[in-house]
């Protein structure tokens, strides 16, 4: 008999196979000798109280051998000569998974990426980290793999109703991801492992007859004579690519793409986003609070670097943590040299002595009305940009970021000294109350005090704020028909993923890319 069993076991006993076998046998009310094999299907940690436990779901073989495990494999048949050509702008998760789905459906994807391939892109991160200079089309936001490649690689998602999440995980594993992402309740790849996975996906696309072009920034959409249907794109070097459809998966930082659409007279919409800071703590502090450790006690065996998720509402606006990076680093995520933007990342082992998270406040469209007359639907981008430029000026240039101890932020004073930080370009003492909008600061102050009651030390003497976090999501939505997924004014244009306002994170963007490819297949040929 092959069955599934859920068990709840304290650590470190949960790490021992024989202890698991006894717990399974007890749950099934059989002798442990009858359990001939077990395989992990899902695991999570229950740290709500002591003792800390693991919740395990196991496939169990009783009185017969356990079938061999078959890891996911993906084979993409070469597309035929007459296959539909689909132009995909952007090679983040939305674009790459759209391309893979096109291949599965017999269409030929033509992927155009403004930045460089992932290996060259990694080299271009050195100037921004070490010399404070951004390579504007090849950085933490732009280039093969998109923003998620070098900003952590979290795969946890709540978007379970948007499509086959398991298919996305299995595709990552088929291209080299650790199979543990199939069983972990909060899967994470790591910025050190994602590049090779992205390269493997590119190889799959090319081997099946697709194309991937780097340093190919799209500057114009090509339309039919009536201007009602898109038929291709033009890149900055003048090359034109034609196809039956254009999937626009350019990410939340491709501001020139929004301006291109606005200048064409296409409808764009304002949407909520969030701004704030990165908050950094010693990882040992977060471990101690989340795992109920005594002062100075090491993290117990079998426990990963602890994480947290915090959220509340203050005066009608959300205040929350964002993209929490246990054992991680704060990185410079600007896309132009006159701005400072911070983000977080972790490597696969999550073994940095620091934890960090975005700590942000919701910005509603009406909060950007000061920019509305000049910028219209792009008022949120103007709001972001103004804050990013001011952040650069406060930091003193060269990607240095303004920073402040949390207790000094609450007291409204510049920090006399700053702790060691993971942010490599460096930090400058500054009163962030004078940098962020007052409506954001007041909610941040109240949120810090509130969250400190839930997570002791969150607003303590070891907590550091680094400004500013502005790229949590796009402040613009590119509208699309709910049924066809095409732009309401331009047939054949499929706004996709996070940059279009329809995703938030790697997995939801990948799912949206798949949906867009499926919608292209359903589109009648003109």
Residue ranges and their predicted role:
Residues 1-54, 58-150, 154-526:
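Residues forming the flavin
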């Amino acid at each position: 008999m092959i069955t599934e069993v859920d068990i709840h076991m304290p650590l470190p006993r949960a790490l021992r196979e024989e202890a698991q076998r006894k717990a399974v046998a007890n749950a099934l009310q059989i002798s442990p000798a009858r359990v001939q094999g077990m395989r992990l299907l899902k695991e999570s940690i229950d740290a709500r109280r002591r003792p800390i436990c693991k919740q395990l779901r196991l496939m169990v073989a009783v009185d017969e051998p356990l079938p061999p495990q078959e890891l996911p494999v993906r084979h993409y048949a070469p597309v035929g000569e007459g296959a539909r050509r689909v132009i995909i702008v952007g090679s983040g998760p939305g674009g790459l998974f759209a391309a893979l789905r096109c291949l599965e459906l017999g269409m030929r994807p033509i992927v155009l990426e403004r930045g460089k391939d992932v290996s060259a892109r990694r080299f271009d991160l050195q100037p921004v980290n070490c010399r404070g200079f951004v390579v504007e089309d090849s950085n933490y936001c732009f280039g093969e793999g998109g923003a998620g490649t070098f900003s952590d690689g979290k795969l946890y998602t709540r978007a379970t109703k948007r499509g086959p999440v398991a298919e996305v995980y299995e595709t990552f594993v088929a291209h080299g991801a650790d199979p543990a992402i199939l069983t972990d309740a909060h899967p994470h790849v790591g910025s050190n492992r994602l590049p090779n996975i992205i390269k493997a996906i590119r190889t799959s696309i090319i081997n099946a007859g697709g194309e991937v072009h780097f340093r190919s920034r799209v500057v114009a959409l090509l339309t039919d004579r009536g201007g009602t249907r898109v038929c291709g794109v033009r890149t900055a070097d003048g090359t034109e690519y034609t196809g039956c459809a254009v999937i626009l998966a350019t990410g939340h930082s491709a501001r020139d793409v929004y301006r291109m659409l606005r200048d064409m007279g296409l409808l764009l919409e304002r949407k909520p986003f969030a701004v704030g800071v990165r908050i950094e703590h010693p990882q040992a502090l977060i471990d101690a609070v989340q795992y109920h450790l005594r002062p100075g006690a090491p993290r117990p065996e079998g426990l990963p670097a602890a994480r947290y998720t915090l959220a509340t509402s203050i005066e009608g606006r959300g205040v929350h943590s964002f993209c929490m990076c246990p054992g991680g680093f704060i990185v410079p995520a600007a896309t132009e040299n006159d701005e400072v933007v911070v983000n977080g990342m972790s490597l696969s082992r999550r073994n940095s002595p620091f934890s960090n998270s975005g700590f942000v406040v919701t910005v509603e469209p009406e909060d950007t009305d000061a920019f509305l007359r000049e910028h219209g639907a792009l008022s949120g981008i103007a709001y972001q940009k103004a804050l990013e430029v001011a952040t650069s000026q406060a930091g003193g240039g060269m990607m240095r970021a303004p920073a402040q101890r949390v207790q000094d932020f609450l007291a409204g004073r510049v920090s006399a000294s700053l702790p060691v930080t993971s942010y490599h370009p460096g930090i400058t003492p500054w009163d962030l109350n004078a940098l962020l909008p007052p409506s954001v600061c007041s909610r941040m102050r109240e949120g810090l005090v509130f969250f400190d009651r839930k997570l002791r030390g969150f607003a303590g003497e070891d907590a550091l704020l680094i400004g500013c976090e502005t790229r949590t999501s796009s402040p613009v939505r590119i509208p699309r028909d709910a049924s066809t997924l095409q732009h309401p004014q331009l047939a054949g244009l499929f706004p996709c993923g996070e940059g279009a306002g329809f995703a938030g994170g790697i997995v939801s963007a990948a799912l949206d890319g798949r949906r867009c490819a499926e919608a292209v297949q359903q589109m009648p040929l003109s």
